[in-house]
A protein has these predicted regions:
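Charged, often glycine-rich, active-site loop that binds/positions anionic groups
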Residues: 65-83
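Short, charged beta->alpha transition segments
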Residues: 46-49, 83-96
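Accessory alpha-helical/coil subdomains and C-terminal extensions
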Residues: 45, 52, 185-216
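N-terminal amphipathic/basic leader segments beginning at the initiator methionine
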Residues: 2-55, 206-207
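Glycine/alanine-rich phosphate-binding loops at beta-alpha junctions
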Residues: 54-58, 74
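Short beta-strand elements in bilobed, periplasmic/extracellular small-molecule ligand-binding domains
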Residues: 57-65
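Active-site histidine-anchored catalytic micro-motif
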Residues: 6, 11-13, 27-28, 74-80, ...
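Active-site-proximal beta-alpha loop/turn segments in soluble metabolic enzymes
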Residues: 68-73, 105-110, 165, 196-205
Length: 216
């Protein structure tokens, strides 16, 4: 039976030390089939998922996708616009989907949410429970994601890029999609988040050289 996957995402690396807010005009917005048309063949994580889904003969149900360059805290209008569109579309399709696949950054901060992705995943979890629907929720994240317990507790799997610069972002999405495929076969998957005690300086996290090259 063909799997139907609801595909959406919001991607922003927020720099809270910047005073200027990031507004709706700063975001590139794709809705419905535009997500597939604008991303197919462009080498993005979304493109990676589209390719994997095609090979698996999955049906992609596109929702909303938003992305902006790294910048300041995201304003409330963006929150409202994204939430409204995402949950309206999810509500319309939720009875006929087998999974949710999300393209996220993992370090987005908005006016009302210090952990935007964690709060967003929690809202999805509550939505599905209220509908008495149980489907996997899988997300691909940026290497620089601030992975929170809330993200882990409210998702089936989050999988981050491994390289900096992010030359593997497309491959990471394919890997996340392959994990979703495995989950369809064996849904009893436990997700574990191992935290580090260290804060790594940006100058030391390039994965082409040591120490990160040896670690990874």
């Amino acid at each position: 039976m063909t799997k139907k996957i609801f595909l959406s995402g919001i991607y922003h690396e927020t720099h809270t030390f910047l005073s200027q807010l990031t507004t709706l005009n700063d975001f590139q917005i794709n809705i419905d089939d535009e997500i597939i048309k604008k991303n197919t063949g462009n080498g993005s994580p979304t493109d990676g998922f589209i390719e994997f889904a095609s090979k698996k003969s999955w049906d992609i149900i596109p929702g909303i996708q938003m992305a902006a360059r790294p910048s300041g805290t995201v304003d409330a209008e963006v929150e409202h616009f994204f939430d409204k569109n995402f949950f309206e579309k999810l509500d319309y399709h939720c009875e006929n989907i087998d999974a949710i696949f999300l393209i996220l950054h993992g370090a987005m901060v908005s006016i009302n949410h210090d952990d935007f992705e964690g709060d967003f995943l929690e809202k999805i979890n509550h939505f599905l429970k209220n509908k008495n629907i149980s489907v996997p929720v899988v997300a691909v994240l940026d290497l620089h994601a601030n992975v929170s317990d809330k993200m882990i507790d409210n998702s089936t799997c989050v999988y981050a890029y491994r390289k900096n610069p992010h030359s593997d972002s497309r491959d990471a999405a394919i890997k996340a999609a392959s994990i979703l495929s495995d989950i369809f076969v064996n849904p009893k998957v436990n997700q574990i988040n191992y935290k580090t005690k260290y804060i790594l300086p940006p100058t030391g996290v390039g994965t082409a050289n040591d120490p990160m090259k040896s670690i990874l």
